[in-house]
């Protein structure tokens, strides 16, 4: 009964907060909020310039490699397992995939900034 009451209160409170979060911004429509911040000066040009696709690809590559490294973080705790061979094989496969991905990026010249 207590858990049901807590669940009901949590759902009600979160629903109320979501409704308020969607309702409040519509009350105060202020057109200057959409303009870019230019330190008090009028904008000289468009603030929405497209950025380099090369930068985007390098950033995505960094995120993918960072995620793969994050998968290796629990490795010291996994050493305490009884079957260490399976854990080491899994870590070796993960590092091999990481190395193959890095080699592929290197061959495809995905890590070079200049063209």
Curated annotation (Swiss-Prot):
Q: What is this protein called?
A: NADH-ubiquinone oxidoreductase chain 3
Under the heading Gene3D superfamilies, the entry gives:
NADH:ubiquinone/plastoquinone oxidoreductase, chain 3 (1.20.58.1610)
Q: Which InterPro entries match?
A: NADH_UbQ/plastoQ_OxRdtase_su3, NDAH_ubi_oxred_su3_sf
GO MF assignments? NADH dehydrogenase (ubiquinone) activity
> What function does this protein fulfil?
Core subunit of the mitochondrial membrane respiratory chain NADH dehydrogenase (Complex I) which catalyzes electron transfer from NADH through the respiratory chain, using ubiquinone as an electron acceptor. Essential for the catalytic activity of complex I.
Q: List membrane-spanning regions.
A: 4-24, 55-75, 84-104
Q: Where in the cell?
A: Mitochondrion inner membrane
Tell me which family the UniProt entry assigns to this protein: Belongs to the complex I subunit 3 family.
- The parts of the chain that form a coiled coil are none
Main location per the UniProt record: mitochondrion
Q: What is its EC number?
A: 7.1.1.2
Topology of the protein relative to the lipid bilayer: Multi-pass membrane protein
Known catalytic reactions: a ubiquinone + NADH + 5 H(+)(in) = a ubiquinol + NAD(+) + 4 H(+)(out)
Which UniProt keyword terms apply here?
Electron transport, Membrane, Mitochondrion, Mitochondrion inner membrane, NAD, Respiratory chain, Translocase, Transmembrane, Transmembrane helix, Transport, Ubiquinone
How does this protein assemble?
A: Core subunit of respiratory chain NADH dehydrogenase (Complex I) which is composed of 45 different subunits. Interacts with TMEM186. Interacts with TMEM242.
User: Might you name a Gene Ontology BP term for this protein?
Assistant: mitochondrial electron transport, NADH to ubiquinone
Tell me the superkingdom of the source. Answer: Eukaryota
Q: What GO cellular-component annotations does this UniProt entry give? A: mitochondrial inner membrane; NADH dehydrogenase complex
Recorded hits in Pfam families, A to Z, give:
Oxidored_q4
């Amino acid at each position: 009964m207590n858990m049901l009451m807590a669940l009901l209160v949590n759902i009600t409170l979160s629903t109320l907060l979501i409704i308020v979060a969607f309702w409040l911004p519509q009350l105060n429509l202020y057109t200057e909020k959409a303009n870019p911040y230019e330190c008090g000066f009028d904008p000289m040009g468009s603030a929405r310039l497209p950025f380099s696709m090369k930068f985007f690809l390098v950033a995505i590559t960094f995120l993918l490699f960072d995620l793969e490294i994050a998968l290796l973080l629990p490795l010291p705790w996994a050493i305490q397992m009884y079957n260490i061979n399976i854990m080491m094989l899994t870590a070796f496969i993960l590092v091999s995939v990481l190395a193959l991905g890095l080699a592929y990026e290197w061959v495809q010249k995905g890590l070079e900034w200049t063209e």
